[in-house]
Amino acid sequence: MKKLSILTILCLVATAIFADVSADLSVSTFFTAEQQTAVVNGDILPQMWVKYNAKNENSVESIAIPTTKYNNEDYSVYEVVTDERFFIPYELNDESKLKFYNVLTSYSGLKGMQYYSRRAGKASLLIKKCYRVKSLSDEKLPDITYDKIEPKISNMFLQKDNKLGTLYFKNELFSDSDNFVMVNTCVIPITKALFTINDKNEYKIYSFFIYDAEAGGYFCYSFQVLRVKLDSVLKSGMISPTTFSNRLRASTVHLYKMLGIDKSDKLNPWVGLYDKY
């Protein structure tokens, strides 16, 4: 009886832990009521944070990443964290859902993405080339046009941009009812100004697309996390949170564009702020 009781307690504890880290993919998991209203009205809500805040650009003291079964990880170990909340008006049916799915896996469609350059004070080219690959090679593969939605698919793509050079990402796309979760994990170390700042799998970008029929579209929450293992690089101000916040905003605006929505006037996430070097 005693052994049975202990076993029962352990099972209950395990269940409680699992429930805690596996929050539902609901709008309220990622958005407060005020945030929901703001994004439906057209706002895009960014946050950015970097350890030591050497350039005094952190917009918040910390960023709490909502935890789900798709991102059960301790994000406090990351030295750079940025996130963004936005809303995509979208009429959902079987055909449009598949279209959205294929847009998310259109790696070649990322070529030409622009970001707001503080140095230039205007939009500049971010992604010079992007395409699907099979491995860590330059062998270009065509995008796959899916004719049905799978619970999970995985691909790899190469991305060359004018800030971080050539990167390789593992892309995972999950389908959960009418919702999607996309995870891009950089599978090579990142170099910044000749310094290798982290190891492989230490730069990640998550995107959650939660459909709300009443609102008529997707509530979207994206975040990126980056390890920077050299304190000297962080303390020197070489790593700016705006650099990564602007990258995240670039991907948001480009996704809108791929869906036929012009948000180019939202390319600068920090209008009137952080414009000086």
Region spans (language model):
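Generic detector of short, well-ordered, non-transmembrane alpha-helical segments enriched
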Residues: T15-A16, I205
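Sec-dependent N-terminal signal peptides
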Residues: L4-T15
